[in-house]
Amino acid sequence: MNQREQSLAEQRTTVLQKADRKIWVTFRKEGIHRYPAAATDPALATGDEYDVSFLANPHRHMFHFRVWIDVWHNDRDIEFIQFKRWLENLYRDSTLSLDYKSCEMMADDLYGLIATRYPNRTIWIEVAEDGENGAVIQYNLTQPVLSIKL
């Protein structure tokens, strides 16, 4: 193996060892929420085709969750089927009654529960209304590196 090939092999090994490993799971839960400000905020209650004042009233969604969490090796120190079942059990009792909570607020609440059970891990949470519109929040322990020089 020449020097260039050796260098590239070492680089691949380093990248593999330092790889950011995550598992992800999905689950869904019915919920009812509302957005009180939609009734009075002129940017929302526009009176035209962009009017969303109806969001001030309680309305139903099927909330779709996708959760990513760090794992430390390829044998999965968090088994994703068990992780999914645990997450589903957090919401097993009836329909979610969320009042004014947004997708972002729901993600923050869920992050607190996950981080308590699985500390010291980067966690990303996506919450979507009916699988159409939603939010993703990345709860990073460290800020992502823009580039790595190997």
Where does each model-flagged region fall?
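Charge-rich, low-complexity N-terminal segments
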Residues: 2-150
